[in-house]
Amino acid sequence: MTAHKLGVHSETGTLRQVIICRPGLAHRRLTPENCEELLFDDVFWVKQAKQDHEAFGAAMTQEGVEVLETGALLGETLEIPEARKWVLDHRISANDVGVGMRKDLRDWMDELPGTELATWLIGGLTVGDVPFEATSMFGAYLGRHGFILPPLPNFLFTRDNSSWVYGGVTLNPMYWQARRPETLLTAAIYRYHPKFAGKVHEIWADPLKNHGLATLEGGDVMPVGNGLVLVGMGERTSPQGVGLMAQALFGEGRATRVIACQMPKSRAAMHLDTVFTFCGDNIVTSFKEVADEMTCYDLHPGEGDKPLDMRHDTRPMFEVVAEAMGFKKLNVVPTGGSDPFEQSREQWNDGNNVLALRPGVVMGYDRNDDTNAALRAEGIKVIELPGAELGRGRGGSRCMSCPTIRDAV
């Protein structure tokens, strides 16, 4: 057990503790017919994806990182009666499962072991899974293989539903409805699990409220150190969400400056960390085709009745970020090296979505040969993990990890 306090104080400082989520039932329920609705482009060979994900966790453990797993944490959390009641009160509501099925479903779930309940909440629940006759209108409408609770395959990407920013955490209101239950379940872990209960400071936002157009996802959030936070605004994170998060951070003195980076709204660039990540010191890897077109909004605490002071900075993003971090310039390693075809291919395969374990040491998919070679040429150690199956989810090692303890640099 680590003795360090919860908090993420940089992008590349020594990683002490991280949460990941293994592939499982939710991914076995992905089909060519439903994968788009569930925000996947393809289906996994789940057996291989599980083995590759185990290798991901084992590699971090070998490097001294304490690796926690979402399903296990949730199962342990649900053994706590107060936590189980809180989760089921909000997950098994008439709005979600209909008036006719709610009581039977709740009575059954109240008696399940925590681990099994966690499996259904993450993996999804069909009419055929329940031990009672689902004779309600909702049950009849769904049919035997219809989802009472849809699966949450994107929980694999633990980065997104919460963001640790310096000494606190945001519980993120996610863009797509298919992902929003992830935030509720993660909030339960933070509020009730013995490893987190009483030690977590929630900065923003309440997972039980409707936040309207204010959306935020962790792949867009980078606490880079010294009170500076970079945030992407693209497909998943809105200006409204960035403004509210910045206001909350400034109000508590947890950040002094937020640079919001405007991105194109595209699947290939859904988050900031799909086009730009830090590797150590001033070295970054980036898909320059997108990054070179991004512009920045510089946010500081406002004065008087003005909640935020905002300036639109039209300089290139790399110049803005370098200056804000105190560097003369950033050493930008292009995704895919110098070949434009490989640049496009390797960006699609998360070539620049790397996770720093400490300054100069990152994890990335083995399939991105040119990106990894270019990083090594700049002195970065790349620990490769198998990406043939996991890469089908369109998320790399940074996407698949939620750091909860990371040192400053």
From Swiss-Prot:
GO terms for biological process: arginine catabolic process to ornithine; arginine deiminase pathway. The active site is at C399. Pfam families: ADI (PF02274). Its EC number is 3.5.3.6. Its main location: cytoplasm. The keyword Ion transport does not apply. Pathway: Amino-acid degradation; L-arginine degradation via ADI pathway; carbamoyl phosphate from L-arginine: step 1/2. It is an enzyme of class 3 (hydrolase). It is found in: Cytoplasm. PANTHER family: ARGININE DEIMINASE (PTHR47271:SF3). NCBIfam families: PRK01388.1. Belongs to the arginine deiminase family. This is Arginine deiminase. It comes from Dinoroseobacter shibae (strain DSM 16493 / NCIMB 14021 / DFL 12). The gene is arcA.
